[in-house]
A protein has these predicted regions:
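ATP-binding N-terminal substructure of ATP-dependent carboxylate-amine bond-forming enzymes
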Residues: 1-105, 371-388
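Short acidic-hydrophobic, aromatic-tinged amphipathic segments that line or gate anion-handling sites
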Residues: 50-57, 131-135, 164-167
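A conserved helix-loop-beta module that forms one wall/lid of the active-site cleft
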Residues: 94-162
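Conserved ATP-binding module of the ATP-grasp superfamily
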Residues: 126-128, 145, 149-152, 161-198, ...
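Phosphate-binding core of ATP-grasp and ATP-grasp-like enzymes
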Residues: 179-184, 191-233, 241-273, 278-287, ...
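ATP-dependent carboxylate-activation loops
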Residues: 280-301
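Peripheral (often C-terminal) accessory segments that flank ATP-dependent C-N-forming ligase machineries
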Residues: 301-388
């Protein structure tokens, strides 16, 4: 089997996918922008061949690279980056070279919030009213029909970037002034719940869920952006059966194969409202957080299903796993040294956040496990408490 990785060097924690695929005897090929000498030794040794391009954004250059690797190594069986930024490139290359997996047409349902909402409804999962915004007349119609407050996001966009909270007439006017009309927006009724949770996991080549989990955000992505808070989220030991039912129905409706999924929900009392479906793993170091919570190795598990093997099971009970960040320029009540001494049994690893995430999420990320929710909440408080 020939497996082509787009951007095998970045993000660095995803290098482990390449390493584990190679450990399964799969021929792993890479195309990226970094010089070959910059690749880590383990990554270099796991790649059968690496083709450097000047610019991964130049699709013609990338296609020529794929054609060369195809000519030299034979048909390509998989093309994958696992990275939001390159999902469309992955899909167009799959279509051009007749490779298994999501094609550009398949991405429409995960790319546009308006399309996602249609499938959430088909899956029988609660949603809030929404409207596609292309003109100022659409803005006025949404205000009249949906009513304030609303949240405004690009219909095709990721995360909290270019997001507006619309509560007053002034907010509407500000949006109209700031809005580049070439960007289609999607307005939705604002949900007052500050509780966001997820249904995340992995499906095999037949679309069957082989792993699923859930985590809660301590703060919403919008709050992180506005208030520069420390990012904290935690994988839960147990999943609410209702959330599982909704998540499984959504995964079935979207019909993706041999990929990770990351679905976000608002929690409203004892019910949930679907927010968005991400056609890739949760960002940053979240796969490592899943691994610590469930005492397994998802990099290895993914390689196993690509190789046609069973997804490996774990005999260990899940635990809470907290991922909590700190900022280098913030002044905290407790020093890192004190916290790591207090939680030495629970502490797993400290990661330095890549520059791309640091401004929004913090400079350092700490992962800790515990069987106790009470202790986990105490850890969030201790790591996050700042001096007055």
């Amino acid at each position: 089997m020939n497996y082509l990785v787009i951007s095998p060097y970045y993000p660095q924690n995803f290098q482990q996918f390449t390493i584990e695929l190679a450990n399964k005897g799969i021929t792993v090929l890479g195309i990226g922008q970094e010089p070959y000498e910059q690749l880590d030794d383990l990554l270099r040794n796991s790649l059968t061949e690496y083709f450097r391009v000047d610019n991964l954004e130049n699709i013609d250059e990338v296609k020529r690279a794929v054609a060369f690797l195809f000519y030299k190594h034979g048909p390509i069986d998989r093309i994958e980056s696992h990275n939001e930024y390159w999902l469309e490139l992955d899909a167009s290359l799959r279509e051009q070279f007749h490779v298994f997996g999501a094609k550009p047409e398949d991405l429409k349902k995960t790319k546009f919030k308006s399309e996602m909402k249609k499938l959430f409804k088909k899956a029988g999962v609660p949603v809030v009213p929404g409207a596609v915004i292309k003109t100022e007349a659409d803005v006025n119609q949404a205000v009249n029909e949906i009513g304030l407050p609303m949240i405004a996001k690009p219909d095709n966009g990721v995360g909290a970037a270019a997001t507006f909270k619309l509560e007053t007439e002034d907010d509407i006017n500000h949006f109209k002034q700031e809005w580049e009309h070439s960007t289609v927006y999607f307005f939705e009724k604002f949900v007052t719940s500050s509780e966001i949770c997820t249904f995340d996991g992995l499906v095999d080549k037949d679309g069957k869920i082989v792993f699923s989990t859930t985590f809660d955000y301590a703060y919403t992505p919008l709050d992180l952006m506005i208030y520069k808070m420390d990012n904290s989220y935690y994988v839960l030991k147990d999943m609410d059966p209702k959330l599982r039912k909704y998540g499984e129905a959504i995964v079935k409706e979207f019909g993706m194969k041999e990929r990770f999924f990351h679905i976000e929900f608002f929690r409203e009392g004892d019910d949930y409202i679907a927010i968005e479906y991400n056609n890739r793993p949760a960002g940053g170091f979240t796969i490592d957080v899943y691994n610590f919570a469930h005492s397994l190795d998802l990099y290895r598990g993914y390689a196993a299903i690509v190789a046609g093997e069973e997804f490996p099971v774990t005999d260990f009970e899940p635990q809470y796993c907290l991922a909590t960040s700190r900022r280098a320029n913030a002044h905290y009540v407790y020093s890192e040294e004190d916290l790591l001494a207090k939680y030495s049994q629970q502490f797993k690893v400290k990661k330095i956040m890549p520059a791309a995430f640091a401004e929004l999420q913090g400079d350092y990320l700490y992962m800790l496990t515990t069987p106790s929710r009470q202790e986990m909440e105490q850890m969030i408080a201790d790591f996050g408490q700042r001096k007055e």
